Amino acid sequence: FVAAKACLKLGARVLVLNRPSDRFQKSLEVLKTENSNTEILPVDCDLQSFNSVRQAGRKIHELCPNGLDVLCNNAGVMALEDVPTEDSFDVQMQTNHLSHFLLTKLVFDLLEKSANLNGEARIINHSSIARKQVKKLEPKYLKKNGGNLGGNGSSIFFGGARWTRYGQTKLANAAFTACLHSKLSLKNSNIKALVAHPGFAITNLQSTTVKDGGMGKLF
């Protein structure tokens, strides 16, 4: 929401990807009211479904035939229960990393088109300091092991299996960005791959974690 708001204030044409919901609709109306002179377009996308992400990729191509200047992979969930998605991956890993990876692949040609036309395009992935709680990426978290990755464990902040899974997703964000940056640099591409840690912010991320039992010891 805040990222979209900032881009709209700069006069950008913004596509906002989200699952259909009352909360999203209310946020969309606020953005439209505050930025009546700019264009904001909703695109249905559920990151817990690869099929939904692919549909969103096709929609973005329809809306941006001349290219995409910036892709901001900003969505995330934190310390949720050990459950699988419909694609059998861990719900955190698919939401936070795998679907972002897929979306990037699906719209990469649009980013290349914009970079060639305008001299630059950017891919921005949001990571977290939580990546430092894990020493290395473990393949099991990237495979179809949803529901079999340590259970729910402790609700202590940055403790237990659910927080380990979250840390793996955030390390995956950073590793993906570093690898992509390296490959783009070798090609002398005008696409920049960047990773950011947004710091602590007032969002609904923590409230969702609390409802799911992931931060009980803090409240």
Pin down the residues of each PLM region.
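Terminal hydrophobic/aromatic helix or amphipathic segment near a protein terminus
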Residues: V210-F219
